[in-house]
């Protein structure tokens, strides 16, 4: 090697072996909250950031809705005094190193703080006695600690903590100065005699220990960092004894399957305890004494976190997809997410309804964006590099699976399908039919599938009058029963067990009323083909398939049917099924499984004419209510042709398709239901029911048709053979569905015909045939 060459010889520092390595359990949730606190000083922020970086695993704690983080911590002896004294957490990144309030806040009840009470004075006293070193004042302080502390507090008018710190300072040969809370101290004008003698004795004890512990003193003597050598040897000896006790405590707790989380100099943090803590600590004290012949006094020390700054409820950070999901539920509410039968439903608080859309999830993430930062890395200055679950497309998709796992409830649809009955959802809130009150905002516990396409309208009597005149007032002479029926249906009063037949001629206003209802109440109003409730003996579909229409409309409130063929009868069993006060029905979509559901709707059949009902028993009759549309709306030139004609409003479309009409029309029905609650159902016009029931219609048909083709004379000389009348009945399309017995009954009771018999034939007397000149084609 030439002289000009520069060489650098680096002494290899021996790798330090930790005294012990533990896994520290902390509240990861509270740690993240601290990192998000504005009042945190920069030094502590860096310390906590680097500490957070060490978390290698997290688990949830459902008992207190916390998240437990785990950190591996290595403990070493001091660099200044290797292999002796206390052990310190590597780089100070442990609960051991944090201030009491910070430590308690991060601990959050996960660990118990077990403390060796009055550790150093107690251990030094025992050491002195074992080595024949007189220590009467130290022994007196250990035996009568509370009394001596009280004396110091009263004499100097200071707090208990100040008194303890003063005595420990004197124990380690410090000056007689009273400590202040800010770290400064002052010399009192008067001193307590006991403390003066206590200080003198401590100096003697330190001198004796230095002579006895020669090897230890030699290390300290040669260490330039140790200024007061005698004080240091006293302290280090106490720390050695303390550490020995600490290790035996560790051995005891681990033998009991109790986890030691953190070493804290004169104690430790432990968790996983079952049983009585007091009994456990007494047993541990005995174990330590048996092992090293030193007595200790253990106590559970309360951990209080009176922080001097405000900590936010939610932190700015999440550390996993699962953590993101948990925080989303905390911010938004778990009840806003339901994974039911393979479908994720998310409550949209902008509409008041559950939606099958991940975009609602993403919208919630964006709303609370500041809380979903994911730390990718942290530099040595504690600065974080982050991504955000609200803006990162890859991250936000990852939480969907965790949401599904945590909110699965395959009974949710079934349990909530009638939860909205008695309520009506508007664009800005919920109307309660039972209290006649509107509340702004939405409730995920009331599951709506539809909503009114309007904000809840203000109550305006003039608008109500105008809407009434344009709708019900124009359609009916006495609309109150019909309005009440619609109001009850809209409120979900399925317990009334009614189906409404609403017959009327063409252009009677039935279609317009349906349009008005749909315009004002949106999807709460459903429509069906009248054939859906007709009887079809050739229909081979299973029942669930037949009721597909009902399943699709299950959450509507009012179902309006269109015209129905008179060639088919109405299914009486279906009437009973759909007016059953909430009995469940089985339905399904095409190629899907059967689902049990409760129809929330009431059916209104808007027919021109009403077919026969089969079967038509008393249960069917009790469920049927009849409301007739009595008028026909025509042009002006046709107005006088019929007594039931009314002038058609050519501008009706533009008049009802307005916000003002909707405001008034909505309150017509809301008021009607309020009146129903106060006064019950109004009386219905029984004449309408009688007019449109099957028996009355049969009478009308038979009498009108017979009178058209025959003349009723009630003259016994006039007669028509029975077989001719029977043939006539069977050939006429409107008579052949009526039974022979019923037909004959009407001839006798209504037309007053009498059956006669001669030697050659049987006949109806009082009747003669009209002559049209040609054969009649009954079809």
Curated annotation (Swiss-Prot):
Q: Does the keyword Ligase apply?
A: no
EC number(s)?
3.6.4.-
Q: Which SUPFAM superfamilies match?
A: P-loop containing nucleoside triphosphate hydrolases
Molecular function via GO: ATP binding; hydrolase activity
Any one Gene Ontology BP term: DNA replication
Tagged with keyword Nucleotide-binding: yes
> Superkingdom of the source?
Viruses
PANTHER family reported in the protein's UniProt record: ATP BINDING PROTEIN-RELATED, SF3 HELICASE DOMAIN-CONTAINING PROTEIN
Annotated protein name in UniProt: Putative helicase V13
* Organism this protein belongs to: Sputnik virophage
Q: Cite the source lineage.
A: Viruses, Varidnaviria, Bamfordvirae, Preplasmiviricota, Maveriviricetes
């Amino acid at each position: 090697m030439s002289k000009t060459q520069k060489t650098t010889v680096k002494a290899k520092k021996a790798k330090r072996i930790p005294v012990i390595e533990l896994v520290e359990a902390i509240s990861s949730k509270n740690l993240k909250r601290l990192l998000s606190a504005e009042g945190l000083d920069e030094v502590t922020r860096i310390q906590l950031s680097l500490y957070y970086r060490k978390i290698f695993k997290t688990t949830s704690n459902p008992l207190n809705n916390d998240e437990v983080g785990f950190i591996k911590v290595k403990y070493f002896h001091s660099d200044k005094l290797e292999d002796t004294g206390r052990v310190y957490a590597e780089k100070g990144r442990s609960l051991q190193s944090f201030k009491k309030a910070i430590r308690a806040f991060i601990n959050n009840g996960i660990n118990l703080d077990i403390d060796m009470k009055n550790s150093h004075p107690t251990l030094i006293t025992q050491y002195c006695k074992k080595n024949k070193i007189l220590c009467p004042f130290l022994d007196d302080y250990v035996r009568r600690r509370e009394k001596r502390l009280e004396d110091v507090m009263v004499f100097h008018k200071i707090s208990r903590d100040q008194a303890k710190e003063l005595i420990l300072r004197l124990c380690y040969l410090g000056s007689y100065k009273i400590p202040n809370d800010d770290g400064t101290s002052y010399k009192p004008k008067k001193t307590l005699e006991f403390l003066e003698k206590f200080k003198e004795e401590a100096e003697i004890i330190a001198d004796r220990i230095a002579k006895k512990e020669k090897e230890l003193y030699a290390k300290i003597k040669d260490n330039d960092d140790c200024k007061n050598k005698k004080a240091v040897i006293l302290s280090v000896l106490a720390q050695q004894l303390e550490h020995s006790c600490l290790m035996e405590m560790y051995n005891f707790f681990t033998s009991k399957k109790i986890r030691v989380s953190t070493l804290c100099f004169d104690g430790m943090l432990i968790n996983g305890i079952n049983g009585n803590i007091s009994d456990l600590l007494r047993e541990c004290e005995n174990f330590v004494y048996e092992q090293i012949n030193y007595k200790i006094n253990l106590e559970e020390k309360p951990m209080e976190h009176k922080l001097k700054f405000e900590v936010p409820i939610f932190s700015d950070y999440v550390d996993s997809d699962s953590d993101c999901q948990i925080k989303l539920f905390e911010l938004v509410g778990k009840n806003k997410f339901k994974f039911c039968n393979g479908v994720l439903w998310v409550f949209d608080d902008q509409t008041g309804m559950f939606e099958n859309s991940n975009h609602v999830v993403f919208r919630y993430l964006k709303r609370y964006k500041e809380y979903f930062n994911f730390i990718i890395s942290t530099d040595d200055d504690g600065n974080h590099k982050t991504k955000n679950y609200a803006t990162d497309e890859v991250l936000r998709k990852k939480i969907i699976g965790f949401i599904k796992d945590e909110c699965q409830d395959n009974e949710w649809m079934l349990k909530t399908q009638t939860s909205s009955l008695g309520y009506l959802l508007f664009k800005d809130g919920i109307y309660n039919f039972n209290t006649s009150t509107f509340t702004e905002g939405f409730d995920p516990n009331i599951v709506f599938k539809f909503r009114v396409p309007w904000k809840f309208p203000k109550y305006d009597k003039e608008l109500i009058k105008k809407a009434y005149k344009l709708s019900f007032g124009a359609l009916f002479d006495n609309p109150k029963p019909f309005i009440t029926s619609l109001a009850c249906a809209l409120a979900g009063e399925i317990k009334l067990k009614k189906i409404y037949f609403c017959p009327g001629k063409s252009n009677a206003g039935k279609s317009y009323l349906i349009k008005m209802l749909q315009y004002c109440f949106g999807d709460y109003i459903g429509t069906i083909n009248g054939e859906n409730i007709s009887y079809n003996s050739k229909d081979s579909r299973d029942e669930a398939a037949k009721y597909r229409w009902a399943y699709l409309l299950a959450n509507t409130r009012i179902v309006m049917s269109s015209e129905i063929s008179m060639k088919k009868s109405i299914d009486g069993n279906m009437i009973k099924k759909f007016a059953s006060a909430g009995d469940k029905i089985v339905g399904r979509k095409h190629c899907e499984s059967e689902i049990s559901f409760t129809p929330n709707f009431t059916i209104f059949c808007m027919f021109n004419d009403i077919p026969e009902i089969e079967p038509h028993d008393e249960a069917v009759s009790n469920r049927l209510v009849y409301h007739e549309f009595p008028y026909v709306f025509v042009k002006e030139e046709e107005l006088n042709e019929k007594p039931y004609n009314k002038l058609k409003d050519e501008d009706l479309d533009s008049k009802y398709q307005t916000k003002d009409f909707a405001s008034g029309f909505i309150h017509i029905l809301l008021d009607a239901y309020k009146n129903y609650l106060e006064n019950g159902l109004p009386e219905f016009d029984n004449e309408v029911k009688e007019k449109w029931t099957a028996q009355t219609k049969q009478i009308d048909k038979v009498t009108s048709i017979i009178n058209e083709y025959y003349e009723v004379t009630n003259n016994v000389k006039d007669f028509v053979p029975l077989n001719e009348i029977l043939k006539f009945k069977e050939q006429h399309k409107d008579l052949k569905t009526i039974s022979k017995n019923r037909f004959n009954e009407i001839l006798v009771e209504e037309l007053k015909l009498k059956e006669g018999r001669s030697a050659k034939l049987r006949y109806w007397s009082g009747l003669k045939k009209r002559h049209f000149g040609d054969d009649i084609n009954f079809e």
